[in-house]
């Protein structure tokens, strides 16, 4: 199973927290000390906590669970999308729309509209419209694709959230808490770990650190999914005898 070592984390700068004046005292158990007014995260804590989170995500994936990757900060946006797509999962990487989980019924209608517009753009409907109308629909399609493209094929609520930056994505975490969906999150020294089921204390800004987390999660999810596919193949093989 995918695991991450202390050396990998040091190389990626996972241990660098935020400036000491911005800290959240709830993160004290995970802080090693401070250097040049910047908190240093205790990787002796992070390594086992991250590997425990990976093992749990592996289990969820092996049971056909759907994992929603959430990271809407500009620096992490593309990496979040790439990681989710690389393991056939789902993502929100631009803006978290309030109610995305708690008001799923409305979101589902917007997804239906997105899919209708996609069909229209491909089957020649747009070409039959006036220029103005076609432009309006193209803009609507782009807007919907931007906000819902990563969840349009999710087909219902996710079974887990993997979040980059618990502070930035607090609305998503709150919605998941309300629905009892487990939250796995990177929690930096300025963030509140409450509401996160699997806390991963670490730097949530450095792109190398973010890429490290996402790569490991995507790998463990792929592995979990292949176990699920292997067991399905075994079952069908037994039935065929």
UniProtKB/Swiss-Prot annotation:
Keywords recorded for this protein, A-Z: Ribonucleoprotein, Ribosomal protein
Stored CDD domains: RPS2
Keyword NAD: no
GO BP, sorted A to Z: translation
InterPro entries referenced in this protein's UniProt entry, alphabetically: Ribosomal_uS2, Ribosomal_uS2_bac/mit/plastid, Ribosomal_uS2_CS, Ribosomal_uS2_flav_dom_sf
A GO CC annotation given for this chain: cytosolic small ribosomal subunit
Gene3D superfamilies to which the protein is assigned, alphabetical: Glucose-6-phosphate isomerase like protein, domain 1, Helix hairpin bin
One Gene Ontology molecular-function label: structural constituent of ribosome
Homology family: Belongs to the universal ribosomal protein uS2 family.
Cross-referenced PANTHER family: 30S RIBOSOMAL PROTEIN S2 PROKARYOTIC AND ORGANELLAR (PTHR12534), SMALL RIBOSOMAL SUBUNIT PROTEIN US2M (PTHR12534:SF0)
Protein name: Small ribosomal subunit protein uS2
Organism of derivation: Escherichia coli O139:H28 (strain E24377A / ETEC)
């Amino acid at each position: 199973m995918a695991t991450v070592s202390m050396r990998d984390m040091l190389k990626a700068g996972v241990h660098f927290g935020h400036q000491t004046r911005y800290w959240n005292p709830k993160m004290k158990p995970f802080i090693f000390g401070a250097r040049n007014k910047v908190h240093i995260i205790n990787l002796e804590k992070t390594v086992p906590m991250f590997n425990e989170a990976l093992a749990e995500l592996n289990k969820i994936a092996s049971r056909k669970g759907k994992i929603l990757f959430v990271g809407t900060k500009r620096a992490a946006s593309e990496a979040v999308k790439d990681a989710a797509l690389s393991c056939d999962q789902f993502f929100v990487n631009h803006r978290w729309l309030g109610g995305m989980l708690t008001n799923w019924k409305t979101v589902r209608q917007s997804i239906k509209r997105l899919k209708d517009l996609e069909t229209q753009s491909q089957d020649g409907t747009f070409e039959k419209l006036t220029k103005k109308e076609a432009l309006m629909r193209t803009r609507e399609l782009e807007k919907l694709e931007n906000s819902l493209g990563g969840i349009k094929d999710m087909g219902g609520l996710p079974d887990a959230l993997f979040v980059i930056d618990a502070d930035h994505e607090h609305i998503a975490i709150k919605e998941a808490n309300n629905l009892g969906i487990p939250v796995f999150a990177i929690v930096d020294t300025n963030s509140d770990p409450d509401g996160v089921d699997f806390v991963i204390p670490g730097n949530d800004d450095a792109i190398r650190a973010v890429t490290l987390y996402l790569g490991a999660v995507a790998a463990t999810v792929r592995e979990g999914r292949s176990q699920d596919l292997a067991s399905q193949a075994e079952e069908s093989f037994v039935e065929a005898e």
